[in-house]
Amino acid sequence: MKKYDRGWASLETGAALLIVMLLIAWGAGIWQDYIQTKGWQTEARLVSNWTSAARSYIGKNYTTLQGSSTTTTPAVITTTMLKNTGFLSSGFTETNSEGQRLQAYVVRNAQNPELLQAMVVSSGGTPYPVKALIQMAKDITTGLGGYIQDGKTATGALRSWSVALSNYGAKSGNGHIAVLLSTDELSGAAEDTDRLYRFQVNGRPDLNKMHTAIDMGSNNLNNVGAVNAQTGNFSGNVNGVNGTFSGQVKGNSGNFDVNVTAGGDIRSNNGWLITRNSKGWLNETHGGGFYMSDGSWVRSVNNKGIYTGGQVKGGTVRADGRLYTGEYLQLERTAVAGASCSPNGLVGRDNTGAILSCQSGTWGAPKIQFTTQTYNLAKNTRNLRLGVHAYCSWTYLNGSPFGGFQQVYSDQNNVWYVSNYAWGNYESGGTISVTCLNLPGAGA
């Protein structure tokens, strides 16, 4: 290369280096802007999440906030309130990257005080540059994003709206975020709270909960796993396999095709225990009870006896077998001897207590039937058994006794004996006679 060309080469190299340096500086600026934009987008998402939580809080507590706010005095919602009620996670920070703190100011709508409107405003910390405010206002997805540039007015993205902070009772400064929640937005939040969701929403159990009565319009609830309720009213039938009740079961009537088993008493306050056919009441443990198998008699199951320490009373009492009494038989009515009676065989008493019986149609004293029996005994008879008699006695001695030993006696069973024999030097008597009296049960 000739010497006179060296200057141009140096000049070309310097120009190239300058262009490269300019490109690097320009790229660094673009990269810096990119990083800032990403940071502001992240801030916008955080503001959107906070605003969404505030919107849900207002929707759930709409009535309460109506009572605590006016058209000029706001109800203020803080980050702590949203975390304590579960609308924000416990790890959500109280301030953003610039140290600004978000709060929501809820007031009544001036034209329709029954409706609520709100504004989310950041305060404190370091102000954002205007470029950041404009970017974040466009990226906020919940409500209408905006910013505060003059310390008094909230301006929407693309300057689409402008509202004085004083309308919401809010205070802030330049370089801060503002989000407008309109009456329509908050009315929708209230409706979201009242809407019953078909599926579970994580962190929102209230969306699967009814807060008022529901009318099914005579339609069915099918494939229900369990129904938990305090009371139930049914105008038709209730069908099921089993039922368990810890309290009372009440109704006008009940029909059971098989059995009813109770662990305690079955009580009727003003009705009957009614059975049909040849059934009645049965004690399963002991096999006794009462039933009717015809139209006349109440019968004992398995012919069980009836035991009571009180009275058994009736028009007539009949025993097909023997009639026993553990004490006495008391006849309360009296009869008069000689008076007419019917039927024969009745037993009564007179006013002195003497027994009377109905004989041939007339009351009379019992007639004692008796017979006599005479035994003629020879000499030298010892302990001759005469048999069972009511009473026996000497009735004849054949001639004067010659002496000896004569005796008529009985044992404890009314068996009578007689002896007639010599005694010492005295000869026994002659032929003797003993006459015995026979009564019913004693000889007769």
From Swiss-Prot:
Residues 362-444 are annotated as: Variable region. Pfam families: Shufflon_N. Keywords: Plasmid. It comes from the Bacteria. InterPro entries: Enolase-like_N, Shufflon_N. Residues 1-361 are annotated as: Constant region. SUPFAM superfamilies: Enolase N-terminal domain-like. This protein is expressed by a shufflon (= clustered inversion region that works as a biological switch). The orfs of this region share a constant N-terminus, while the C-terminus is variable. This is Shufflon protein C. It comes from Escherichia coli.
